[in-house]
Amino acid sequence: MILGIGTDLANIERIERTLDRFGDRFRNRVFTEIEQRKAERRSDTAGTYAKRWAAKEACSKALGTGLRMGISWKDMAVSNLRSGQPVMQVTGWAAERLREMTPEGYEAIIHVTLTDDHPWAQAFVVIEARPLAEVGEVNLTYPAPPRM
């Protein structure tokens, strides 16, 4: 079952201007160290940050709150599997909100997709609830997400 859907569109040039103006103050407030290392290795640094910004906004919307109620930007972090697939991890308040919205007997799975076409970066986040398998039962309908 779908628990939440969120989307966001970010202007790469706006993020680039913000990076130029505020530098590390902006980076350290919004992005985890892993996100920063990833972005700084890319030729399109601003585009990489913009996609992650959009993903955090989209995730907060999928959680049903937007960026309020004590949520921290760093409570939501985007990384990538070896295949390149983006994944969203939540900690702190965002993880607490996710636990609250997940029905008993289910596990929450966060799906995220990112794209960009200069000057735009876009993200979609879907939060899905999958039934937990009974002890000793194999849940073939809902395979486990890929391991990182």
UniProtKB/Swiss-Prot annotation:
Organism encoding this protein: Ruegeria pomeroyi (strain ATCC 700808 / DSM 15171 / DSS-3) (Silicibacter pomeroyi)
Name of this protein: Holo-[acyl-carrier-protein] synthase
Swiss-Prot/TrEMBL cofactor(s): Mg(2+)
Cross-referenced HAMAP family: AcpS
Gene3D superfamilies tied to this protein: 4'-phosphopantetheinyl transferase domain
InterPro entries to which the protein is assigned, alphabetical: 4-PPantetheinyl_Trfase_dom, 4-PPantetheinyl_Trfase_dom_sf, ACPS, Ppantetheine-prot_Trfase_dom
Enzyme Commission code: 2.7.8.7
BP-aspect Gene Ontology terms: fatty acid biosynthetic process
The reaction(s) this protein catalyses: apo-[ACP] + CoA = holo-[ACP] + adenosine 3',5'-bisphosphate + H(+)
Subcellular location: Cytoplasm
Cellular-component GO terms for this entry: cytoplasm
GO function term, MF aspect, one: holo-[acyl-carrier-protein] synthase activity
Family as reported in the entry's similarity comment: Belongs to the P-Pant transferase superfamily. AcpS family.
Keywords: Cytoplasm, Fatty acid biosynthesis, Fatty acid metabolism, Lipid biosynthesis, Lipid metabolism, Magnesium, Metal-binding, Transferase
Job of this protein: Transfers the 4'-phosphopantetheine moiety from coenzyme A to a Ser of acyl-carrier-protein.
Chain sites annotated for binding Mg(2+): D8, E57
Claim: Cytoplasm is one of the keywords in the record: yes
